Curated annotation (Swiss-Prot):
The protein's name: Hedgehog-interacting protein
Protein function: Modulates hedgehog signaling in several cell types, including brain and lung through direct interaction with members of the hedgehog family. Soluble forms inhibit Shh-induced differentiation in the fibroblast cell line C3H/10T1/2.
Disulfide bridge partners, by residue number: C216-C536, C218-C543, C402-C624, C435-C452, C500-C594, C612-C623, C625-C634, C639-C649, C643-C655, C657-C666
GO MF, one annotated term: hedgehog family protein binding
Organism, as annotated: Mus musculus (Mouse)
PROSITE patterns: EGF_1, EGF_2, EGF_3
InterPro entries, per database record: 6-blade_b-propeller_TolB-like, EGF-like_dom, EGF_extracell, Folate_rcpt-like, Glc/Sorbosone_DH, Quinoprot_gluc/sorb_DH_b-prop
GO biological process, one term: neuroblast proliferation
Keywords linked to the UniProt accession: Cell membrane, Disulfide bond, EGF-like domain, Glycoprotein, Membrane, Metal-binding, Repeat, Secreted, Signal, Zinc
Region described as Interaction with SHH zinc binding site: spans on this chain: 376-388
Limits of the EGF-like domain: 607-634, 635-667
UniProt binding sites for Zn(2+): D383
Signal peptide: 1-17
Positions glycosylated per UniProt: N99, N416, N447, N459
Amino acid sequence: MLKMLSFKLLLLAVALGFFEGDAKFGERNEGSGARRRRCLNGNPPKRLKRRDRRVMSQLELLSGGEILCGGFYPRVSCCLQSDSPGLGRLENKIFSATNNSECSRLLEEIQCAPCSPHSQSLFYTPERDVLDGDLALPLLCKDYCKEFFYTCRGHIPGLLQTTADEFCFYYARKDAGLCFPDFPRKQVRGPASNYLGQMEDYEKVGGISRKHKHNCLCVQEVMSGLRQPVSAVHSGDGSHRLFILEKEGYVKILTPEGELFKEPYLDIHKLVQSGIKGGDERGLLSLAFHPNYKKNGKLYVSYTTNQERWAIGPHDHILRVVEYTVSRKNPHQVDVRTARVFLEVAELHRKHLGGQLLFGPDGFLYIILGDGMITLDDMEEMDGLSDFTGSVLRLDVDTDMCNVPYSIPRSNPHFNSTNQPPEVFAHGLHDPGRCAVDRHPTDININLTILCSDSNGKNRSSARILQIIKGRDYESEPSLLEFKPFSNGPLVGGFVYRGCQSERLYGSYVFGDRNGNFLTLQQSPVTKQWQEKPLCLGASSSCRGYFSGHILGFGEDELGEVYILSSSKSMTQTHNGKLYKIVDPKRPLMPEECRVTVQPAQPLTSDCSRLCRNGYYTPTGKCCCSPGWEGDFCRIAKCEPACRHGGVCVRPNKCLCKKGYLGPQCEQVDRNVRRVTRAGILDQIIDMTSYLLDLTSYIV
């Protein structure tokens, strides 16, 4: 009631003509390069004089200190004329339909749009010359439109029953023209409005002395037509290829020249069980390249599946971690026959999965797992559930042992413990939304900086950023940052920017939420404390492109540049995913100091990768033979029992017999063969033939 009273008082002031304007101000720059100002009724706006401001101050006092539209447009306004539509233009049912404080704040701002000196431009365009009778809104800035939709859609029933893209298709400004809000907004959290050049003319003409910071960054659309891209990583081999993961089970290569290879680098879509509904986290989860990938060709993949051998048991699906090796002949394709299963975790639910894989500077593989929404009752009542849930695992994959895929680092906190699995490095996580390793940590006391986004177990509506430290329990451990998200979207972890192009972003941890809001964390060099700051991204008026859609993940290339992966729909089958790169508009896209020499990807050249064909080789270069093979590089076949009468074992349990002998081990004499007196010569020929056949089998 108090808010409505304040608006009525303002309308009364308009009707009685309390405000007097100077028509010359609104007409001053009509012929100049400044943006043409017109109110909704076609008249120029008026300048506020001192007595007008006193009246506004009195109205603010009557409203209990609420800032009215005079606070948004303190110098020039269209609410000073008796024939102005004023605030009543937008006084319909939606502005009193919510008790949500955040939504109310946005509605109060939108109510003041008719008072803007650019109100005619905000409400009328050639494509939209008639106002909608049910919901009369100005043309909103794209990020503001999304913020309004996601904040208010649950509090204004019946009016916003649509998607964010459809809503903003009509109510967001599509061209480079002015959009609402056209006044500086104080941001408690979240990005500032994504416009860089739209306030400049207004401040110059209006005589506003406040300093407006033009420190926004931009996004450059790199690739479109992707299917639910969830991550983008590099191999660290000098080729500067970017490997894009699609949720359905594909990994694609983007070259430094911007070409997307037609043939996928990895295709396991027949193994991957992916979810098609929003909130279903199943699918291809993560990819990490071995630090020595250039020599050993090893990579590690995590995905969800449901194979037959797990068909019986207390689970919905299986989270699996697998080692693959790149093809010996084609460096742009994985040999799927080299798959070695590292880890399998039974999951009951389709959320809180985690599955992030990454290598630390210590060379160990880190696996970040969510709690899978598993309760203590689930753990007690059902056998077969993993003890790894909600944990960070640390494994040593550089092992020469052929019977186990990894070893346990002796520095793991539970190496000799009986209470925790020795693989566990830290635990107490709930819903890790992506983690990243800082490649250049600034704190000399910490040689490993892993930052993760996570939900708060005690209060699921809040989120937190964690710094993963050895042996910590994050059920009780304080987080780096804990806050209530500025929208209802879950957090999506990003990367610590260590690139070259956007120098202003250097050292900042870039992350966001699912609904397209971006934040950064910066560590103070003095206090070592992490401070939260909004990340401002410019709109199309100041940048070559703008961000749209939901954030699915972040990526990092070999130079340390950060990428954003998005999609406007949650269906995995749709090709509307995009890849964006964060760039600084004040610097060239590729400054001279950022240029590096690209090394074309080459096939593996090590002896083990070329000769170990009847087995697999470990990341350290040891050839582990498949059953039935032995010797150096597994080139000697084994026959058990051994071949008799001079027969040669050419394949596992396959003997090539001399003439005159039969049977699996050449143990039988062939009675039908005529004996030849020169048996010695024939035996030599048979021996030579056996050798040639054996050699041919190796070559094949």
